[in-house]
A protein has these predicted regions:
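Short coil/turn segments at secondary-structure boundaries
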Residues: 22-29, 114-118, 187-190
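A short beta-sheet element
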Residues: 38-40, 48-105, 114-126
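Alpha-helix capping/hinge segments and adjacent helical runs
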Residues: 16-20, 60-61, 205
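Non-catalytic DNA-recognition/assembly elements of restriction-modification systems
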Residues: 1-20, 27-38, 128, 136-140, ...
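Amphipathic alpha-helical coiled-coil/heptad-repeat segments
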Residues: 130-206
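Proline-centric
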Residues: 1-6, 86-96, 110-111, 124-144, ...
Length: 206
């Protein structure tokens, strides 16, 4: 077997100590082009970065730790800022950040999360999370297969959305044509609508 299990803390460096939180009010005077990351991704843009490179970010607290309504782990690359609601990691041994990101997003971490009203994945527990590690070539192939699968899903979603819009348009068109008398041939020998209304009026009076 070429795979093994190892704790996340043994293959990563943690950079949480370099994070700097800035509240929304103070960010008003710092507007700029650099992404400002929180637990679930970009929440603002500021005028200077505190990180420059490629990092793995993992949400530290909040409801998303349980609900997973958006990815818990994601890649930040280039120049950016991170607040104290996302752990920030780099890896050892050329292990691709994408490999770890995809793994973290594929498993439930309930065992490592503390708190109920305010769920939290603290740094010590983060380091203890077991991760399956394969040879680098296999890791790269896994990443490729996942990306291709996600791309297929996205294309299918786009096609499905387009078809649903077309169905809505067709539905409206059919109703419109139906009540304009365009779905059935017009027979001059048929009694007119006026004649029908006269008959209804007579029936009501009788």
């Amino acid at each position: 077997d070429t795979w093994c299990w190892i704790k996340l803390g043994e293959i990563t460096d943690n950079h949480d100590g370099e994070r700097i939180p800035v509240n929304a009010k103070n960010r008003e005077s710092m507007k700029g082009k650099y992404p400002y990351y929180g637990a679930s991704g970009i929440i603002d843009y500021v005028n200077k970065p505190i990180f420059n490179g490629k990092y793995l970010l993992i949400g530290e607290d909040g409801a998303n730790l349980i609900s997973r309504s958006v990815p818990l782990a994601f890649i930040a690359e280039g120049k950016f800022w991170v607040n104290n609601h996302a752990h920030i990691l780099t890896t050892w041994g050329d292990i691709p950040l994408e490999f770890l990101s995809n793994y973290i997003n594929s498993v439930r971490l309930t065992k490592w999360i503390t708190g109920t009203a305010q769920p939290k994945l603290n740094q010590n527990n983060l380091k203890k999370i077991p991760v399956p590690v394969s040879p680098l070539e296999e890791q790269r192939e896994i990443i490729l297969q996942i990306e291709q699968g996600f791309s297929l899903i996205k294309n299918t979603e786009n096609i499905t959305n387009t078809m649903l819009k077309q169905l809505d348009t067709l539905h409206s068109s059919i109703l419109k044509q139906a009540f304009e008398g365009k779905l059935v041939p017009q027979d001059p020998n048929d009694e007119s609508a006026e004649k029908l209304l006269e008959q209804i009026k007579e029936q009501k009076q009788s």
